[in-house]
Swiss-Prot record:
Domain Urease, chain residue ranges per copy: 129-567
Residues reported to bind Ni(2+) 2: 217, 246, 272
Subunit-structure text: Heterotrimer of UreA (gamma), UreB (beta) and UreC (alpha) subunits. Three heterotrimers associate to form the active enzyme. The apoenzyme interacts with an accessory complex composed of UreD, UreF and UreG, which is required for the assembly of the nickel containing metallocenter of UreC. The UreE protein may also play a direct role as a metallochaperone in nickel transfer to the urease apoprotein.
Organism: Klebsiella aerogenes (Enterobacter aerogenes)
Effect seen on changing residue 136 to A: Abrogates activity and reduces binding to nickel ions
Protein known as: Urease subunit alpha
Activity regulation text: The apoenzyme can be activated in vitro in the presence of nickel ions and carbon dioxide, which promotes carboxylation of Lys-217.
NCBIfam families: PRK13206.1, PRK13207.1, urease_alph
Substitution effect: residue 221 to N: Reduces activity 50-fold
Top-tier EC class: hydrolase
């Protein structure tokens, strides 16, 4: 057998076991753990390459081969960092393994035939599409912005640029829920709606769940009282949906202990659990220590930088309909912004105590920066804290798995959609993001939605080849016409699906139901299940984890920043 140098092999087929890859311009390095292709039998498309008739491509009919194969991909997911071919059929992941022609090649698990399209993933990283669970539906254009960043599923609420939606992620009542489901039917992303959970009697909540929401949002701007919390969780337990909480910053109806008592050990998703985005001041951060609390962050506090504090005050005044000329409004805003808890938040993410990241889109958060900021935190923590104790080699594999889980599998588990999305696993919707390593986390090379390319960078349309500048992200065929209805999912509650909501509203997209929302616990949060004892000093706001002071220095320079956005 002929030999090839490791560098030449990587140049031709991408990295293999033992090779290391740097993520963008961060200090994060991953090492390939396994290679599911077969050395000497790799498939590659192009002139003089393998995927040709009678060679890597067989004679089987469409029923017996995949629709799409991503060749020689470096998969980065919560379950591993693995080199493999990825086969897609009928919009779902068919197999992860070895592609080729089973008539002449060994170990083939992904048959290639005349019906198979190829995406060349040699030298590329492939991740699952991101999931953003904190969406204010202020404008529909957020969907394309999110898709360009690598987010393919959006969970939240709202009705457009109304005061209520500027502040809260609630789509209130059956009429608005129906209209928003119809509007979202044409968006190129998966969606799930949250209803308004702020009532103390259950019938107004039940009718929203029956209308189609997959969760209820309790927000202090509508009154996050213990009675409302208890009522929403009671209905959630009854109808198997999730509850998301933005708790009472002003401590008017109780303190964090009262909110935890009202929750009563039941599963709940706490938004921006550090507190700058809202929640009991100054100690809502302590909630993430509890086994039933699924804590997330929104991205304006991630990572902690020199500008974080100054930026927040103006954001908060605008989003929560506050008046800078009213002293009480200013005091309310200032009570939420604490250097000490923001500095601790990054460390809690690195420890795996905070489980999810999200945006808070146009409402104190940036919809296109969930993925980017998650990796900036990972970089900052690598630089400040060094290698994690869980690492087993000279790489950052465990840290990378911890951080990618925060915006993929963990939000999917939290909201009962992990059976459909959230990871690169057989049977799940083929929502896949292809990255060049140098642009990882910043600018995808291709975003695949339900098996079709939905958006990608594209050069001059009148050029003789697709690459000449100016290059812009443009919607592709998977995001157009009736095709998008086959490539996306609308998530509904089980009650709504059983009641025929999709048929009554003439929704054209595929429907999936949420399930398992009430049994998921902090222990189920992949690589992010730590439940330490957390205390906050009421005077200094210092945060201690198991008695140890935790903090971080504000960054003055970040990777994945200006140098990537000069063009």
């Amino acid at each position: 057998m002929s030999n090839i140098s490791r560098q030449a092999y990587a140049d031709m087929f991408g990295p293999t076991v033992g090779d290391k890859v740097r993520l963008a311009d961060t200090e994060l390095w991953i090492e390939v753990e396994d290679d599911l292709t077969t050395y000497g039998e790799e498939v590659k498309f192009g002139g003089g390459k393998v995927i040709r008739d009678g060679m890597g491509q067989g004679q089987m009919l469409a029923a017996d081969c995949v629709d799409l194969v991503l060749t020689n991909a470096l998969i980065v997911d919560h379950w591993g960092i693995v080199k493999a071919d990825i086969g897609v059929k009928d919009g779902r992941i068919f197999a992860i393994g070895k592609a080729g022609n089973p008539d002449i090649q060994p170990n083939v698990t992904i048959p290639i035939g005349a019906a198979t399209e190829v995406i060349a993933a040699e030298g590329k990283i492939v991740t699952a599409g991101g999931i953003d669970t904190h969406i204010h539906w202020i404008c529909p254009q957020q969907a394309e912005e999110a898709l360009v960043s690598g987010v393919t599923t959006m969970v939240g609420g709202g009705t457009g640029p109304a005061a209520g939606t500027h502040a809260t992620t609630c789509t209130p009542g059956p009429w608005y829920i129906s209209r928003m489901l119809q509007a979202a039917d044409s968006l190129p992303v998966n969606i799930g709606l949250l209803g308004k959970g702020n009532v103390s009697q259950p019938d107004a909540l039940r009718e929203q769940v029956a209308a189609g929401v997959i969760g209820l949002k309790i927000h202090e701007d509508w009154g996050a009282t213990p009675a409302a919390i208890d009522c929403a969780l009671t209905v959630a337990d009854e109808m198997d949906i999730q509850v998301a909480l933005h708790s009472d910053t002003l401590n008017e109806s109780g303190f964090v202990e009262d909110t935890l008592a009202a929750i009563g050990g039941r599963t709940i998703h706490t938004f921006h659990t550090e507190g700058a985005g809202g929640g009991h001041a100054p100690d809502i951060i302590t909630a993430c220590a509890h086994p039933n609390i699924l804590p997330s962050s929104t991205n304006p506090t991630l990572p902690y930088t020199l500008n974080t504090i100054d930026e927040h005050l103006d954001m908060l005044m605008v989003c929560h309909h506050l008046d800078p000329d009213i002293a009480e409004d200013v005091a309310f805003a200032e009570s939420r912004i604490r250097r000490e808890t923001i500095a601790a938040e990054d460390v809690l993410h690195d420890l795996g105590a905070f489980s999810l990241t999200s945006s808070d889109s146009q409402a104190m958060g940036r919809v296109g920066e969930v993925i980017l900021r998650t990796w900036q935190v990972a970089h900052r923590m690598k630089v400040q804290r060094g290698a994690l104790a869980e690492e087993t080699g000279d790489n950052d594999n465990f840290r990378v798995k911890r951080y990618i889980a925060k915006y993929t599998i963990n939000p999917a588990l939290t909201h009962g959609i992990a059976h459909e999305v959230g990871s690169i696993e057989v049977g799940k919707l083929a929502d896949l993001v292809v990255w060049s390593p140098a642009f990882f986390g910043v600018k995808p090379a291709t975003v695949i939605k339900g098996g079709m390319i939905a958006i990608a960078p594209m050069g001059d349309i009148n050029a003789s080849i697709p690459t000449p500048q100016p290059v812009h992200y443009r919607p592709m065929f998977g995001a157009l016409g009736s095709a998008r209805h086959h490539c996306r999912l609308t998530f509904l509650s089980q009650a709504a699906a059983a009641n025929g909501v999709a048929e009554r509203l003439n929704l054209r997209s595929a429907i999936a139901v949420v399930k398992g929302c009430r049994t998921v616990q902090k222990a189920d949060m992949v690589h992010n299940s730590l439940q330490p004892n957390i205390t906050v000093d009421a005077q200094t706001y210092e945060v201690r984890v198991d008695g140890e002071l935790i903090t971080s220095e504000p960054a003055d320079v970040l990777p994945m920043a200006q140098r990537y956005f000069l063009f």
